Amino acid sequence: MIKVIGTMFRALAVVIGFLSVAGCSPREPDVPPDLFYLFATYPVGKNPTSVATADFNQDGFTDLITTNISDDSLSLLFGNGDGTFRAHVRLSVSKEPRSLALNDYNGDGLTDLAVACSGSDQIALFFGNANGSFGRGQKYNVYRSPISVTSGDLNGDHKPDLVAALRNDKIAVFLGNGDGSFTRGPQYEYGDTPTSVALADLNRDGNLDLAVSNGGPMSSAVSIWIGNGDGSFREPTDYRTGKRPLAVTFADFNNDGITDLLVINGQKDSFTTFLGNGDGTFQAGTDSGADAGPVHGLAGDFNGDRLADVAIVNIQSHNLSIVYGRGDGTFGYPPKNYRVKRGPFYIAPLHLRTGATEEPGLVTANNAASSISVFLHRGLKSRT
C-alpha cells in the first residue's frame, strides 16, 4: 500500500508481468571487442560509494568527485585534461555521505552538489565557486537514512528539484526555489527499501517521471511513478525485476526512440531491461547475465554502432563488465570483463577533452580499495 504523507489518497500497486531470460537462447557465444583499458587509479577518501564528473573549476577539463562513506568526506580531483588527475582535495560533510546529485541549484551557472548523508539523516547542499571550491549551504533533515538522490525540474518552473530515496520505505521530494534553497514537497511511503532513484519523461507529456528500485527482501521490483508536473506523482506501478535490485537508469535499447529501463540486480548476477511503450508503461523484463555481485551500471554506445550497451561494476568479482547491445533489447554474452581494484561500487561516464579532441571513458569508485579507476577507450575519439 502506498501512503502519501500529508495528502489523502492511498492506492495499491500493480505488479506487472514476468521475467524472460535472455541466456536461454541457443545462439553461439559472442566474442566481445576489447575496447577499454585501465589508464590510472587514484586514492580518494575511505570507502567511496559514488563518483560524478563535471568541470568544477571552469578550466575546460573534466574533474571528479566522490562520496566517501567511512570518513564523512567528499574527494575532489581536478583533471589535467589528459586522463590524469591531481591529488584529491578533501571536503568534510555530514555523516556517511552515500550519493550526490549535481546541478546548478542557485542559478549562478556553476555546478553545485546535493549530498545524501545516510548517517546524519540529511540532504546537504554545497554551492560551487568558479575556482573549484565549494561553499556550504543548508542541510535538510529527512527521516531516515537517505540512500540515493537525483535532481530534475519536477514542476515546470525551470528550477532544479530533488528526489531522495530513504531507507525506511519513503520517497522525499524537495522543490527548488532557484536560489539554492528548497521547499519540502510531498513525501511518499511505499515499497521495500528503495535503493536508487532516476528521473525521465516516460510518457512524453513533458513532465518528469520517477523510477525507484526496491531492494528489500519483500520486494524485487522497480516502481514507476508518473509525474503530474507539479512536483507530485501518481500511484506507482511495480514491475518485477531480478533479485535485490540496487540501481536503475534509462536508455533506448531497441532503437525505437522510446525510453527503456535498466535495473542492476545485486543477487543472481544479472541485470534486467524493460522496453518502454512510450506511454509510461513497460513490457515484461528480460534478464541478462553479468558477473559476480553487480551493484551499479549505466548505458552508453561503447563501440560506435549507435546501439546502447551496458557497463556494470561487480563487487564480488572485482571487475567492470561491458555488455554490447544488439539493438533489439537483447545483449551479447559473455561480457567483456576488466579487472578493477577491490570492491568496485559505482560507475560514471567520463569524457576527457584535450584541445579539440574528446575521448570517452569510464570511472569506477572502488569501495574496498578507497580509490577510483579511470578506463579510457582504445578508439573512439571525436573532434569537438
Regions found by a protein language model. Give the residues of each.
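Glycine-aliphatic tripeptides that mark coil-to-beta-strand junctions in extracellular
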Residues: 60-62, 109-111, 158-160, 206-208, ...
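Hydrophobic beta-strand segments that make up the repeating blades of beta-propeller
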Residues: 64-67, 113-116, 162-165, 210-214, ...
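Beta-propeller blade termini
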Residues: 49-58, 78, 98-105, 147-156, ...
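Bacterial N-terminal signal peptides
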Residues: 10-20
